[in-house]
Structure formats: C-alpha cells, structure tokens
Amino acid sequence: MKILMSNDDGVYAPGLLALYEALSTMAEVMVVAPNSEQSGCASALSITTPLYTHQLPSGFIAVNGTPADCIYLALNEIYSDTDFDCVITGINSGANLGQDVLFSGTFGAALTAQLFGIPAIATSLVGGGAKSSEQECERHYQMAASEIVKLLTDTPILDICKNLPYHVLNVNIPDVSNADEINGRKMTVLGHRKIARPVHHVVDPRGRDAYWLSLRKRQDIWADNTDHVSSGTTMTDDQAVAAGYISLSPVRLHHTPAATLDMLSALML
C-alpha cells in the first residue's frame, strides 16, 4: 500500500510525525507538507507565486505553499508516477468539526486529493494535546495515530472510500492519552456552530489598526442539529467526540442539494 500524507500545521508538526510513524508500519508513506503553518487556508492554491521544494533528512518534502498546493504538486509532479492507494492528512492540531471543514487546510488537502480521484481521509485530534505537557502531548498524538491505523486495518474503510467518489472522510479523535478512554467509533454528520469566531482589534506600534481572526475559539455554542440528522440514532460530530467517540463524517464534494434544486426549479422556471 502507498499513502501520501500532508497537513496544515507544517512539516515539523508532531501530529504529522506521529501519523507517519504509525502508518509506516503498514504502508509505504510519502510526505509532502507546507514548510510553515497554513491553518485556515482551506483548499487555496498558489497561482500567483512560484512553489519551491526542499527535501528534509527525514525524506519529507517541504513546500512553501498551502496544503492543497502540496497535494497538487505531489500528484502531478513530485510523485506523478506513483499510484497512491489513498491520501491521509493530519493529524491536525485541534478539532475540525462542523463548518471547520470549510476553512481547514487539513481538510482542504484531502479535498484536493479527491478531485484527482484519490480516496482521502482528513484526521484531527480534538484539542491537539493543548491541555498536556509536551511529553504527554506526544503520547496523545501517538494514541490518535494508532487509532487511525486500527481504522484502516480493522475495517473496510479504504475499500468503502474507493467506491465513494467525491467524498472525503473527516475523522476527529478525542484528546486522550489511552485508547481505553475512547468509547468506540460513530458515523456522524457535521454539526453547526451558532456563533462566529471573534475578531480581535489591536493598534500596531505605528498606530495602524490591525485585526486578528481568532482560531482559538471562546466556548463553542452548537446549534440544534436535528434537521441534519438522518435518523434518531445518528450523532453530529461534536456530540460524538464530546461523548468520547471517534467521529467519522463522510463529506460530499457535490454540495447542491437535490431537493432544494427541485423546489427552486419549480418556483423559478
């Protein structure tokens, strides 16, 4: 098996390293990732600036671009002669729940892979070990990585993904250090936050107004998601991780809802 990896936290991120080490026990793994953090850039491509690559002693390839750039470059140039079985991105530092997928570079990289017909899985550690010491944080990522390997080896998820074109599997893993703290896996739908992330206004040393779009949220407030749930037993992704489950959300690239399209067509035409 051949797996291509990337992320949005950068080529030196602990989540990327932990996942690489875990996946390398079961597959040949290649890494092409940004040379610096690219959180929040979604599936943006660099079309006005050139991209440069640098191979690290680890064999990882660093790119001065976005996560989507990395996948685009890997599939069409660097590893264009390689038939990858799948692309796995992450492990992201922090959750990618609900509408996070619209902004996440980790998800955007997986999305780019699917546009080229490669099965893709985006992975995130909810909390990203933020509550832990550096050593404990490393254990959390290692635990999350081992759960991803179990998902690939103990379930037919890769075969399922291969038969679901234009879908990305979005995986969120609770931030714990021991596997026995995880209650299992749940298939979920994306949740929905009721409030936007705050904007912080500051004045820089030259007296100019400056604004920070905060990626570290205040307390999340989640909407009632019952209208998105397909059955009474289906959880949203945020509900699942809050209950100690690994959340698995299939996300379809085809965003046009057929029922809404039919309704509007009947009204407009």
UniProtKB/Swiss-Prot annotation:
Keywords: Cytoplasm, Hydrolase, Metal-binding, Nucleotide-binding. Pfam families: SurE (PF01975). InterPro entries: SurE, SurE-like_Pase/nucleotidase, SurE-like_sf. It catalyses: a ribonucleoside 5'-phosphate + H2O = a ribonucleoside + phosphate. Transmembrane segments: none annotated. GO terms for cellular component: cytoplasm. A divalent metal cation binds at residues 8-9, 39, 92. It is found in: Cytoplasm. This is 5'-nucleotidase SurE. It comes from the Bacteria. It is an enzyme of class 3 (hydrolase). It comes from Psychrobacter cryohalolentis (strain ATCC BAA-1226 / DSM 17306 / VKM B-2378 / K5). The keyword Membrane does not apply. Its EC number is 3.1.3.5. Binds 1 divalent metal cation per subunit. The keyword Nucleotide-binding applies. HAMAP family: SurE. The gene is surE. Nucleotidase that shows phosphatase activity on nucleoside 5'-monophosphates. GO terms for molecular function: 3'-nucleotidase activity; 5'-nucleotidase activity; exopolyphosphatase activity; metal ion binding; nucleotide binding. NCBIfam families: surE. Its main location: cytoplasm. Its cofactor is a divalent metal cation.
